[in-house]
Amino acid sequence: MNRDLSKGSVVKSMLLFAIPMILGDLLQQCYNIADTLIVGQFLGEKALAAVGSSFTLMTFITSIILGLCIGSGVLFSIRFGQRDENGLKEDICASFFFITAVTILLNIIAYISLSGLRTFLRVPDEVWGDMKEYLFVIFMGIPAVFLYNYFASYLRAIGNSVIPLLFLAVSSILNIILDLWFVIGLKLGVAGAAKATVISQYLSGIGIMVYTLMRYKQVCAIWKIRYLKKERIREIISFSMLTCIQQSVMNLGILMVQGLVNSFGTVVMAAFAAAVKIDAFAYMPVQDFGNAFSTFIAQNYGAKEKKRIQQGLKAAVRISAIFCVVVSTFVYIFSKPLMMIFVDAKETAIIMEGVRYLRIEGAFYIGIGWLFLLYGLYRALGRPGMSVVLTVFSLGTRVALAYILSAIPAIGVVGIWWSVPIGWALADIVGLLYYKIKKQNLVEKEPEM
């Protein structure tokens, strides 16, 4: 199932590699969709607001792990393109030890800081009880998030995007079954929804680890100290930490916006919780396509296939644009029925606020589609620092505008919604201008690791 992306048709290579990744992440969204749908329909508005705020926080925490795994995956792709098997083993060993340590530390910090989150996120009293109960359980799944994303990153780096999809498919089905059983059958409340997600996460995490260790002997280097080199650890830290910073800054900005949203009350919180799930589901395919594109570029960068890099970029821009136009049209037209999937039809105030959010965000998905391509391009060319710059620029603009615009009485909460596409557009302009100016140097020079 391995795929050498430095050979064959450019468009076909990218699409065949990207499709399983897209399907896989759409299934992963089903983890969160199942929680939101069942909680919203059977546990009510306050529980939905609690799970929605928890989702934003967990996205921030797991983004740190995800960033480290994505960064390591890019290095794996470059080594694979270079046919450097020994270097690949050393990177595997160094990255596994480092990310394991970070995961353990992160899990400890999450539990220690649990009580302080109430003030930081401005969580209303009537929501905090459910939110705390949900988070206490969901934090147990952090190690599982690491296991799945680490081994999935390795498999994708060598061109295998099918196996991660299969493990996610099984765990997603299990998640939905357990959600229904725990919440509706056993009446376990929000804790039941969290338990369903955690059990499913461990199934996919442990399963993909066992498969990868049995199928690819070079991955057994994670246990072999002789492959643990100081220079590789420095390389992993310098490269992966920048990708980690990019992912965590991205979600820290969203977390700050969540705090602002919470200050507008339970109705806006619930609308945001449901709409964000739809939003993430809608643009998740272009995010995954951006990650697949990054692997394509990294393998070709390692193989020194400069012409294919240029061809791949042009093709990716067109593919992303076509997809975004289709999805934007769908979300804009069907925003109300989409909201009613998560919210009872009687909750008209929540539905209408969610519709307003979706029609503003949905009209500009092409902005985030191209931004994901730029993130992937700069990571793959060994310039993760530029991805961080674009993320800080986009999120900085978004957070600043959200606070400024929402403070104007005539604009209010809608200012938060408009800040998002504006941030996307400005970051796109900066990223494209930088590429246009530095194009030749980016492809010619060695990666900055």
Predicted regions and their residues:
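Transmembrane helical elements of multi-pass membrane transporters/channels
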Residues: 16-35, 137, 171, 200-204, ...
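Small-residue-rich hydrophobic transmembrane alpha-helices
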Residues: 48-108, 145-164, 271-335, 368-390
